[in-house]
Amino acid sequence: MNTQILVFIACVLIKAKGDKICLGHHAVANGTKVNTLTERGIEVVNATETVETANIGKISTQGKRPTDLGQCGLLGTLIGPPQCDQFLEFESDLIIERREGNDICYPGKFTNEESLRQILRGSGGIDKESMGFTYSGIRTNGATSACRRSGASFYAEMKWLLSNSDNAAFPQMTKSYRNPRSKPALIVWGIHHSGSTTEQTKLYGSGNKLITVESSKYQQSFTPSPGARPQVNGQSGRIDFHWLLLDPNDTVTFTFNGAFIAPDRASFLRGESLGIQSDVPLDSNCGGNCFHSGGTIVSSLPFQNINSRTVGKVPRYVRQPSLLLATGMRNVPENPKTRGLFGAIAGFIENGWEGLIDGWYGFRHQNAQGEGTAADYKSTQSAIDQITGKLNRLIDKTNQQFELIDNAFSEIEQQIGNVINWTRDSMTEVWSYNAELLVAMENQHTIDLADSEMNKLYERVRKQLRENAEEDGTGCFEIFHKCDDQCMASIRNNTYDHTQYRAESLQNRIQIDPVKLSSGYKDIILWFSFGASCFLLLAIAMGLVFICIKNGNMRCTICI
C-alpha cells in the first residue's frame, strides 16, 4: 500500500514539472516614469527626452558664411557711417549684430526701424548700384565732425546737399530713379532738422523747406523742424532716415528745396539669411541651425527650454524642463515572489522578464531537454515599427523657421512692441500646453499598442495549441504531450501542427484531469482532512474509554 502511494505522488510531481511554455515581455529593474492622457507617473521600459536643455555658448558657424558686424549696426550698412565702411556690400547667410554696433554717426534715427532690421536680417547681404543723380548749383560735400574718417566726413552712401554758399538760396530740384532690376530696391533718404533756424538758413537759405517723395505706392511730404536739442556727438541737429522698397520698373521721385539728405546708391537684397543679436564668440568648428543671444542650440529634439527668443530651425520653446516620450512598453519589474516554475511570471501582462534583452516580447519554455528563453521578433518588430519615428513626427509637427524680434522699440513703436511681447508670451503658454498634450497622447498610444501586441501574441499561441495544452492563468500553457526544442520552436514561429500531437495530448489529459485540483478545492480538502482527523482521534479516545469502563479498568461516577 505504501509503495502505491509513493508511486502516485512521484507521478504527480513528474507531471507537475512537465513541458510548459510561457509568454512574457521585457522589463527592467528601474524604468522611467511618463505621463499619459489618463495617468501620471506610469513606469515604462524606455523613454526619450523631448526637451533640449543643453546649450553651446558660442555661435556655431561651420558650413555657413557668417558676417560679424562688430561696431557696425545692421542699418548702418545702408547709409555708411565710418564704422560700417567694410560692410557697405556683403554676402552672408548668418548675420551677427553686436551690442557695441552703431547704425549712425550724425545723431538721428530710422523710421520703422524694427521692420527694416527684420528685412536686412533675412536679406542674405546687400549689393548696391548708383542711382545716377547729378547736381549743379549746390554743394554735395556736406561733412560733419560727428562722422570722422581722416577728418570730418559724412555717410558714405548719402549726399548732404547744401546751398552753393552760406545763406544762399537753395534751388527747387527734382530727381528720379527707376528700378531696373527684377527685385525690389531699398531706397533710404534723410531729412535734416537743424539745431536752430539760423543754422537752417545758413545751410539752405531762408524760407520754408519741403521735401516730397513719390512712387506708385508711396507718397509722403516732409518739413524739417529746426530747433535746439541736446547735443549728441557734438551736434544739436538730427537726421531722420526714411525708406521704401521700390518695385521693379517703378520710379521714385524726390522733389526738394533744402534740408534733404539724398541717397547715392540703391540697395538690393542678395537672398536669404538669419540674423542674430549676440555678444558670444563665433566657433567655426561646430555647426548648428538654431541660434539665440546666448549661443547655439544643437538638437534633434522637438522642444527646448533654453531661450524663447531664437532664430533658425528651432525646437519649440516650452516652459517644462522635461517631457518624456515613451519608446517602450509598460514596465513592471520582475518580482521573484511571483515566479512559478523556472521563472514563469504570474500575470503576463502585469509582470515582465528582466532577462529578455533582445526583444520586447518572448517565450520561456521547459521540457525534457531543459529550459530556454527566446524573443519573438515578429511582435517586437511590429510594435517597434509603429513606435519608431514618434520623435520625428513630433519634430515635424513643431519645428518651423523663426525670426527674432528682440530690439528696443521707439516710443511710437512701443505699443507694437508690447503686442509682440504679449503675443510671444501667449504663444509660449499655448505651446507648453500643446507639447504636454502631444507627448501624453503619444505615450498613451505607445502603452496601449504594447499591451495590444502582447495580447495578439498570446492569442496566436492559444489558437495553435488548442486542446493540446491548458492555460494556467499565469501567462503559461501546460502542454499535454512531450514537446522537445524543435516542437517549442514551431510554437514560437507559428508552424506548430496540433493534429500531430492530438492523440497523445488527449490520453495524458484524461490521466491528469481526475487528480487536478484548483487552489480553491485544495483549501476545502485541507480543512475537510483536518476536521476528519480530529473526529477520528476523538472517536478513538471515546472507544478506549468505553472499553476500559466495560472491563472494569475505569470507573465513572456521576454525582448529582
Curated annotation (Swiss-Prot):
Recorded GO CC terms: host cell plasma membrane; membrane; viral envelope; virion membrane
Main location: virion
Parts of the chain that traverse the membrane: 524-544
Disulfide bonding pattern of the chain: C22-C476, C72-C84, C105-C147, C483-C487
Keywords annotated in UniProt: Clathrin- and caveolin-independent endocytosis of virus by host, Clathrin-mediated endocytosis of virus by host, Disulfide bond, Fusion of virus membrane with host endosomal membrane, Fusion of virus membrane with host membrane, Glycoprotein, Hemagglutinin, Host cell membrane, Host membrane, Host-virus interaction, Lipoprotein, Membrane, Palmitate, Signal, Transmembrane, Transmembrane helix, Viral attachment to host cell, Viral envelope protein, Viral penetration into host cytoplasm, Virion, Virus endocytosis by host, Virus entry into host cell
Leader peptide range in chain numbering: 1-18
Gene Ontology MF terms in the entry: host cell surface receptor binding
Keyword presence, Signal: yes
Record: glycosylation sites: N30, N46, N249, N421, N493
Function: Binds to sialic acid-containing receptors on the cell surface, bringing about the attachment of the virus particle to the cell. This attachment induces virion internalization of about two third of the virus particles through clathrin-dependent endocytosis and about one third through a clathrin- and caveolin-independent pathway. Plays a major role in the determination of host range restriction and virulence. Class I viral fusion protein.
Homology family: Belongs to the influenza viruses hemagglutinin family.
Protein name per the record: Hemagglutinin
Origin species: Influenza A virus (strain A/Turkey/Oregon/1971 H7N3)
